[in-house]
């Protein structure tokens, strides 16, 4: 499976799972919100195991850039807060770092 697709799926699963906890603790949502949150976090962890990488830490580090961009998309689409120029600039820097980690020459 394509690494980018796995990372995007993992990001959505992680953000949704964490938001379920946020909703319960910060927004007063019912405790049953934790059940889909836990399932979503388990899916996130599973998806990261599908990434072709010799080292887990490298897979997680590269994923970080995708997570940040997905978090800003969530901020805008779910929470209704438009990312500002600093959010976008920071995300671009993180994506550049993720690209270096993913595709940098090894050896």
From Swiss-Prot:
Primary localization: membrane
Transmembrane segments: 5-25, 31-51, 61-81, 85-105
Entry membrane topology: Multi-pass membrane protein
A cellular component term, taken from the record's GO annotations: plasma membrane
UniProt cross-references to Pfam families, sorted A to Z: UPF0060
Location relative to the cell: Cell inner membrane
This protein's record includes keyword Cell membrane: yes
Keywords: Cell inner membrane, Cell membrane, Membrane, Transmembrane, Transmembrane helix
Keyword Cell cycle: no
Entry similarity comment: Belongs to the UPF0060 family.
Protein name according to UniProt: UPF0060 membrane protein RPB_2370
Organism: Rhodopseudomonas palustris (strain HaA2)
Taxonomy of the source species: Bacteria, Pseudomonadati, Pseudomonadota, Alphaproteobacteria, Hyphomicrobiales
